[in-house]
């Protein structure tokens, strides 16, 4: 996949970085792990340490594969799990933001955080499958004027 990425300085909550932050999201029903692995490998080859992979922290489907392959390939990796999840060492936000009561809105807040933090969003969508969370992240990214690539 050809990603036209430029070295940008981004500021998120008073943090400046020169890494290109690539949010990779997708349905829990997404099963083509080879496409995800190939994308992350291509990013590693093209950008190396200048890339940061961003995910939503789900264990199943696309998010689970993103985490697995980003860490296996020793990529910079950050995640924004929903606030009712437990904090882990890959979370961007502090531990005090996690282990909260469950609300459906936690997922939408997480999707917005991914869109705001990332420079580009790559969305893996399983054909003929509803993926409201992935669509939500795409919508927020478009509102933020971020580049969005959809892979089926």
Predicted regions and their residues:
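Charge-dense, intrinsically disordered terminal/linker segments
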Residues: 1-16
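Acidic/glycine-enriched connector segments
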Residues: 12-20, 28-152
């Amino acid at each position: 996949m050809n990603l036209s990425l430029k070295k940008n300085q981004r500021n998120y909550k008073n943090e400046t970085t020169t890494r290109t932050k690539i949010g990779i999201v997708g349905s829990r029903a997404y099963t083509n792990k080879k496409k995800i692995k190939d994308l992350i490998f291509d990013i590693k080859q093209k950008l190396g340490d200048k890339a940061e992979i961003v995910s939503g922290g789900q264990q199943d489907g696309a998010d689970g594969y993103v985490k697995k392959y980003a860490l296996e390939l020793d990529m910079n990796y950050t995640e924004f799990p929903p606030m009712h999840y437990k904090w882990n060492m890959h979370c961007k936000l502090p531990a005090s933001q996690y282990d909260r009561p469950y609300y459906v809105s936690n997922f939408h807040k997480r999707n917005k955080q991914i869109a705001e933090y990332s420079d580009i969003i790559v969305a893996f969508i399983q054909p003929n499958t509803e993926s409201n969370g992935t669509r939500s992240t795409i919508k927020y990214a478009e509102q933020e004027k971020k580049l969005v690539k959809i892979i089926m």
